Structure formats: C-alpha cells, structure tokens
C-alpha cells in the first residue's frame, strides 16, 4: 500500500471522485410500466382539477336541498324520480324543481341538483309502479337490488346544499403540486398521477454501475465448485446493494487472476457504465491482480476493520472504486464509502446513522476504526439495545446476514462498557 489514511479522508476522496455523478440526466417513464421505484426529477403538477366535474359521493338520489329541507322520520318528502344517472360517459339532463334522479357513486350530479340523499335516508322507493317497503333495509343501490327505473322516492332526512356532492378541484386543484421532486415512486404515487390524467413522469436516470468480481477461484452460485474454488458472494451482494441504493447494474463481470484480462474487462465496463466497482486483488499479497492491472489507480490502506485495503481512481476516464475481496469487507466498504453517494446521485437522502446503547461491553484494538456487525435486541429494563454479532473476521458472511447495523467504534477507543452509546449504520 502506498499510503495510509483514516476513514473520513477516504470518504472525502471518494466523494470528490464521484462528484460528477450527482448531475444526473432525466428520462420519461410511463405510469403503466417502469415507474415503480424511480425518483421524480421534478414536481408533478395537476393539469386540471380533480374531480373534473361535480359527482356523487354516495349511491342515492340527487335533489334540490330546498325540496327536502322538511324531510324527517314520520314526515317524509315524496319526490318523483325522473331518471337514473350512472357512473358512465355522458352528461345528465338538468334537474327540475320538485324532482329527483337516482344516482350512483361517482356519477355526474345534474345541473340544478345541489345535494345527494343517500339510499340510507330513503324509506320507500317505487319501481315502475311497484312499491318497495324498505329501501334502507334491503340495500337498494343503483343497479343492485332493482335494475328497473325508480319512479318515486320517500325521503326521510333532508340534506343541506353541498352534502355528498364532490365539487371540481375538491381533491386536487388545477396547478396544484401532486407529487414532489425526489419522491420515490410507489403504487399510490402512480395512482395519484394517473388519476390526474398524467401518463408520463420525469425521473432521474440512475447511476449505472459495473460490478466486477476478480479471482480465478470464483464460480457462480449456480455452478459446482472444483478443488480450491468458492462461490462468488461479492458479485450478487454488491449488485443488490447498488439497486437498493437507487443505482442500476449496467454490467456484471467475473474475471480471472490475469492482469490483461482484468484490464480488458475493466475498460469494457468503463465504456458501458458510469462507475466501475471491483472486488478483490487490492491487498498486499502475491496475486493482487487489480493493482497490477490498474497502475494509474491509487491503492491505500484505510485505518478501518474490516475493509482496510481500498483503491480509487479512473480507468478509461471513468471513476473506479476497488474494494477488498473478503465478503464482509466488501459489503462494509459499500455502506461506508459508496451507499450514500449513490443515493445522493439518485435524488435520495442519505441513510441516517442511529445512536444506540450497547447490550454488552466490548474491547477494540487501538488505531483502527472498527465497524462491527450488530443486531437490535430488546431489554426489558433498558429498551432497545444493540449487540455485536459474530467475530471480527472479514470472511464471516453468516454474521453479516444476521446483522441489522454496523456498530461504529472510533479508532482511539479500546473499550466500551455495557450501556455505552455508539453510532450505528443501518444495513
């Protein structure tokens, strides 16, 4: 290693290297497909009011409020029913004074009507001369118990003007902001846009990352390893981490311990993606193939454990980050050095670090910042605390799988007692 730096220095250097990624282009996606999980690049503004027209909030009868003002149980108001209005295309005829129309939820309220009397506030409805003796009890709804046209209705409760009538713009006014820039689109956001008649959404183009695993010993998880071979955990893990941080995987490569093959693969990755991310071949062993293939990249030792060996620079003009090959080291490196930068480039906020109390005392070697795997535990007296999971080894993937957080122990700290406050990085 050519130099040794602390964690914050390396974080700052990585941030400078990747600063250009923050200026993301935009693209249009359809609300029908491809919008889920994308980040809005600009506010979404309603092109018109929602609802677009006056419509009924209930199944019932559209009336003039003045015509039913005196209605009460025992002294109903009887009105002729002059038609039906369904939630269907078309515009209903104006309502004449002293009449009613049967109306369905969402149907346009006729001009002249200023209130809707719910079915529950009617007692007897006559259908083509046949009297129904209890509309409230038998659940008469538009087109439900009776599909014939109603001719007369007895209303037992008056309704004030405006009751159960949805006015245009009462949900969303024309020109109102429906969705804010930076929103991560979920199904309910897509629904809001579609309901406003917005078919296309402007989203940020995610950072495209090439994930390159190095090592002749690696085989894919669906292959049978031979003697001395292991399954590649870093490729799938870091590809998933990239997507979880708002990026996209533009290329997945696994290359053997051959500097020329590695160099060719990385140049191909640089031509296709915004960022190249490698794992393995960056320490001080005899076969550190990434170091051999990239003499223009800075390799250094960062005062942290796990994840000390790191590299950063450019290949073919593209930024490249080189992480260690041990699985825990690679995942910790992603969380500490890259996750928030990818999120920022994608328009997402950083993952908030969380203070926590230790469940038990720990000791830590001086001189290296420790990032221990931890999980949340419940203490009946002290409440939620964080406990160390597994040992310090950078190969212990089971402990990483069981962890909820990384416990951050400063380099100068050699012991922390039970109950001591620590900073955690959520995984």
Describe the residue ranges of each PLM region.
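Structured loop/turn residues at beta-strand edges in well-structured enzyme cores
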Residues: 56, 96, 117, 271, ...
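Conserved active-site and cofactor/substrate-binding residues in soluble primary-metabolism enzymes
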Residues: 5, 9-12, 27-30, 34, ...
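Short, glycine/charged-enriched hinge/interface segments at domain edges or termini
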Residues: 2, 44, 62-256, 385, ...
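Helix-rich terminal scaffold detector
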Residues: 2-8, 199-323, 327-333, 344
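Flexible glycine/proline-rich
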Residues: 28-33, 42, 55, 88, ...
